[in-house]
Amino acid sequence: MSRLQLALNVDDLEASVAFYSKLFATEPAKVKPGYANFAVAEPPLKLVLIEKRGSGGSINHLGVEVPDTAEVEAQQERLAQAGFATVEERGVECCYAAQDKFWVENTPNGEAWEVYTVLGDSPQACDGSRCCEVSAGC
């Protein structure tokens, strides 16, 4: 299953988790210090909340979660054929998860887009990969 990811900066993680739990009638899939994510079934959405006081209400980054690394590679190849520049990351730790991914470069409005798959849980927020720059504080 593929689904859209929306990563939001929030001022108050606890209040935001309470709000989105009610809005989507689901509990978060993962909660860590300064970080939470929801696997919303309907509509299919990965909602990520990153506590960044003073930046609440803004988009942190956007993404598409895909089922496996083969799909990450297929999407990266498709975008390369369409002329998109990408930055590949494999086996990185990002947002408390091990991931294979790539980032789309040079978006027209400067937003950060990733296509990724989750390989498993990770005890750390990030490992110095690009995720740490984009999601600083996740």
Regions inferred by a protein language model and the residue ranges of each:
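A short, sequence-level motif marking secondary-structure junctions
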Residues: 51-55, 120-121
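Short linear motifs in intrinsically disordered
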Residues: 25-30, 67, 90-94
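Vicinal oxygen chelate
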Residues: 3-11, 39, 54-138
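N-terminal beta-strand motif that seeds the catalytic metal site of vicinal oxygen chelate
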Residues: 1-14, 44, 61-62, 124-138
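Core segments of cupin and vicinal oxygen chelate
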Residues: 2-46
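Structural preference for long, well-ordered alpha-helical segments within the folded cores
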Residues: 18-19, 78, 109
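Conserved beta-strand in the GNAT
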Residues: 46-50, 114-116
